[in-house]
């Protein structure tokens, strides 16, 4: 049976060259955010708890300023536009699964990815400070407090005839990478794929991803 490629692609540090949450915090947050970041990386607190607390340090009134800042400074990784066009031409389902927040993920992907194919955390600006919401929290099979739970989304969106490929770079992509049939990896995720013996290939740009997918189409 021929299998259908299905792609799950991270946003921060994968589609974009930098991590947008870190960029926001460096630009707008008081120094307390650093300790929260360290606690997340050391797994002393969950991603959900840490990200929620970091954004609660920011006044809701900064929303427009933050979006303007990211529009000016965010760079999409080379080849991403061509990669999106490639998936559309070949009819390959592409889902963006992001630990980022809706108020900046949607504007940065506008005109490239249909909103219904983007899965990320939500936001509420009705209070004094920014409150993050979690429309894609962990299902019953995950207790990691992921925030936007990528393993849960893969379980939900997987196809019986699917060959599921995860594209990512960081610790937030590791759990879903373990569930995938194949991983396109860079940075931290690449090291972990090598250590754990996960089926993978490295990438630097999305042109590399296109090349790998073209080879996969022949195999699957």
UniProtKB/Swiss-Prot annotation:
InterPro entries: HAD-like_SerB, HAD-like_sf, HAD-SF_hydro_IB_MtnX, HAD_hydro_PyrdxlP_Pase-like, HAD_sf. The keyword Glycosyltransferase does not apply. Its EC number is 3.1.3.87. It comes from Geobacillus kaustophilus (strain HTA426). It is an enzyme of class 3 (hydrolase). Keywords: Amino-acid biosynthesis, Hydrolase, Methionine biosynthesis. GO terms for cellular component: cytoplasm. CDD domains: HAD_Pase. This is 2-hydroxy-3-keto-5-methylthiopentenyl-1-phosphate phosphatase. The gene is mtnX. Pfam families: HAD (PF12710). NCBIfam families: DKMTPPase-SF, HAD-SF-IB, PRK09552.1, salvage_mtnX. It catalyses: 2-hydroxy-5-methylsulfanyl-3-oxopent-1-enyl phosphate + H2O = 1,2-dihydroxy-5-(methylsulfanyl)pent-1-en-3-one + phosphate. The keyword Phosphoprotein does not apply.
